[in-house]
Amino acid sequence: MAVKKIRPLTPGQRFRIAPDFSVLTKTKPEKSLLLPIKSTGGRNNTGKMTIRYKGGGHKKRMRIIDFKRRKYDIPAVVNSIQYDPMRTAYIALLYYVDGAKSYIIAPEGLKVGDRVLSGNNIAPEVGNAMPLRTMPTGTIVHNIELHPGRGAAMARSAGTYAQLLAKEERYVTLKLPSGEMRMVLGECMATVGTVSNSEHNNIVLGKAGRNRWLGRRPRVRGVAMNPVDHPMGGGEGKASGGHPRSRTGLYAKGKKTRNTNKYSKNYILSRKKR
């Protein structure tokens, strides 16, 4: 996937770097795999705002993604590569030989007409899904489960991947996209390859209106608020706000927020890079 620079015919196009959708298939989404999404505007069931700076945007429909890949030893053919408004990665529509259809996260390099497979004793080729214990050491993977059968939880966004470093008895060691080294059960499923749309981090929207199309409202700085609204608010003139804090008063630069008694701390061999 590549990006393209737009000619500066208008102020909104001057700095815009847009995604190049030439790798996508010009087709409509599969109706049987769509769900309607009701816009909440960041409000909960009582109408109170729980998420700020959210609302508006274009109407979307959710694609039902197969994060489990448990159709073992049933070949599937890639029918199309499509855009998904709910995520940064592209998705691939699979047609199984038994007549079933499903969407998966499209790995980099997967093309229309390619065959993919899930199972225990299959080749570690791009798009194939298998338990981590059956993969060779050094394999690049994405769409990784944390608990067997629950579906993928890690390395799902555009351009991300993890590397299988070692295998010991029931567990394997992975280097995650954050740089964290973590042990995961060997029975957990993962897909071979890197997630598609790796140039996503180079995209520049170019104007505020494009953020509004995505459902993002303007974010107010803490120092621009009143003291009643934010710890960094108030002051005479343009005050710095003092030491950076979150709206709830926590230090915003470097304070560890992870629960030190969390059960999974024993599976983390080294923390993510700063």
Swiss-Prot record:
A Gene Ontology biological process term: cytoplasmic translation
PROSITE patterns: RIBOSOMAL_L2 (PS00467)
InterPro entries found in the cross-reference section: NA-bd_OB-fold, Rib_uL2_dom2, Ribosomal_uL2, Ribosomal_uL2_bac/org-type, Ribosomal_uL2_C, Ribosomal_uL2_CS, Ribosomal_uL2_dom3, Ribosomal_uL2_RNA-bd_dom
Any one cellular-component term (Gene Ontology): large ribosomal subunit
Membrane-crossing segments per the record: none
Signal peptide segment: none
Single GO MF descriptor: structural constituent of ribosome
Domain of life assignment: Bacteria
Positions of the UniProt region annotated as Disordered: 223-274
One Pfam match: Ribosomal_L2_C
Family under the similarity heading: Belongs to the universal ribosomal protein uL2 family.
Subunit organization: Part of the 50S ribosomal subunit. Forms a bridge to the 30S subunit in the 70S ribosome.
Functional description taken from the UniProt entry: One of the primary rRNA binding proteins. Required for association of the 30S and 50S subunits to form the 70S ribosome, for tRNA binding and peptide bond formation. It has been suggested to have peptidyltransferase activity; this is somewhat controversial. Makes several contacts with the 16S rRNA in the 70S ribosome.
PANTHER family, sorted: LARGE RIBOSOMAL SUBUNIT PROTEIN UL2M, RIBOSOMAL PROTEIN L2
HAMAP family: Ribosomal_uL2_B
Name under which the protein is recorded: Large ribosomal subunit protein uL2
Gene name for this UniProt entry: rplB
